[in-house]
């Protein structure tokens, strides 16, 4: 708006509504607000990434199920969440379903997955399931010192001399899965694992030399206990360890 001093015949144009330097101050104010907003977003995202990494490292981690060796409890391409407090603060138990790193070339040569940088970052942070196919998932049947054998006259697995009835074995399979009989003692610091799909699981039975030494999985290779199926949503469910199966099994004797 133009303003004039009629006594001196001088007019001036005030485009800022009467506030000198208003446009420049507005721009500086907006730039300051934008910088503050960006800084807050960076802080929030950084804290979220750190928190995700801490959760993945110490508490929970998602994994992808690459095969049908645990059917029908788990099926191929399920996504599960694994609790990292087992083993550790929460002790391993017979019947636990555990994810572990390949203990001795059980998987052979695994091709390297081709991922985008974003996919790799999400897996590293624990925001996407590990699909590297370098891990296995099986059920713990024997703890350190346990004597595990298969099969008795009724075709059942025995642990420390007690036959167990396993409702989680895939319908149509036998507890032995048609594999040769065995009788082993689980070495210290290891566990004996078997898949629920007994006829289609390359587990401890397939990698042992008859002593339990080679087929048993070192506990320090275990990443954690599978807790829940989270994907697909139609299969959302808890993964339980049926303690009643092993309730009458005595502790291992020295």
Residue ranges and their predicted role:
Residues 1-7:
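Short, exposed "boundary/linker" segments that immediately precede the start
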Residues 4, 47, 51, 91, ...:
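Hydrophobic (often cysteine-bearing) scaffold residues that line and stabilize catalytic clefts
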Residues 40-58:
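Hydrophobic membrane-insertion alpha-helices, especially the h-region
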Residues 8, 13-36, 58-59, 63-64, ...:
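Soluble "head" domains of membrane/secretory-pathway proteins
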Residues 4, 43, 129:
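Residue-level marker of regulatory loop/turn positions in helix-turn-helix DNA-binding domains and
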Residues 2, 28, 44-45, 49-50, ...:
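Generic hydrophobic alpha-helical membrane-segment signal
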